[in-house]
Amino acid sequence: MKDVQRIALLFDFYGPLLTERQQELIRAYYLEDHSLAEIADADGVSRQAVHELIRRSEAALQEYEQRLGFVAEHQRRLRLLDELQEALDRADLSAARRALAALRAEA
């Protein structure tokens, strides 16, 4: 997964845990595709200051994922659902049952 996509996904899950300022910067840089210079000019701070806060915000998102693992669990469930769909498409009922059992085991 590309870094931008990964940060966006982490932000979807853990964004509310960041400070308001961190949320604004992640949103501007990753979701709205503003450059560091554009953000710095709009905020009246240096480009380096914006860069540093974005990096700290990324680190916080990574730390939340490392501790909580919600994104990894979400991706695992999506893979199981894909396996289930493929098994059903092939009419492989035993594989479909295994995938369904794996999903149920989580509930």
Swiss-Prot record:
Main function: Might take part in the signal recognition particle (SRP) pathway. This is inferred from the conservation of its genetic proximity to ftsY/ffh. May be a regulatory protein.
Family that this chain belongs to: Belongs to the UPF0122 family.
| Cited Gene3D superfamilies | Winged helix-like DNA-binding domain superfamily/Winged helix DNA-binding domain
Source species, domain of life: Bacteria
Q: Which organism is it from?
A: Symbiobacterium thermophilum (strain DSM 24528 / JCM 14929 / IAM 14863 / T)
- A Pfam family matched in the record: UPF0122
Protein name, per record? UPF0122 protein STH1464
Query: Which InterPro entries does the entry link to?
Result: RNA_pol_sigma_r3/r4-like, UPF0122, UPF0122_fam_protein, WH-like_DNA-bd_sf
Q: Which HAMAP family match?
A: UPF0122
